[in-house]
Amino acid sequence: FWILSLLFFLSCNRNSFSGIIPQTQFTNQEFDRVNTYYIYDYVSKDQILEYSSKQVHKFGRKSIYYFFSHNANIPTDKLKYADSIIDIRKNLKKYRHSLKFVSVKQSSEKMEIIDCLDDPSNLLCNFR
């Protein structure tokens, strides 16, 4: 009985991030990062926070993680070969209507998450 319970628990937790699909990863010369992801509707804010906290981050730098609706069509090549974070933000601005969450890890290692559906005027959500 215990073995079956353990297997059930492990199989449920194994896919706790299955609704988060990595897309583009960009790192500039200073090791600031921008990552984009597609997410399904059932992914919660808590799951995104947990997932974001496990991503690679260089101490003293800034990491921004953009989580778009799974049916968004983000131009990954334009992002992958961008010259700067400013270029990436210009490209992503065109798709802000599909942006669900933004997660930011500041140089202090503090993680912040913004729900863009609840706060669309947030500067990180509208790319201003």
Regions found by a protein language model. Give the residues of each.
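Short, surface-exposed polybasic-aromatic patches that bind anionic ligands, especially phosphate groups
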Residues: 21-34
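Bacterial signal peptide processing site
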Residues: 13-15
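C-terminal motif of bacterial Sec signal peptides marking the signal peptidase cleavage site
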Residues: 8-11
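C-terminal partner/receptor-binding element of secreted or periplasmic proteins
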Residues: 89-128
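Mature extracytoplasmic domains of secretory-pathway proteins
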Residues: 33, 37-99
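Sec-dependent signal peptide recognition
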Residues: 1-6
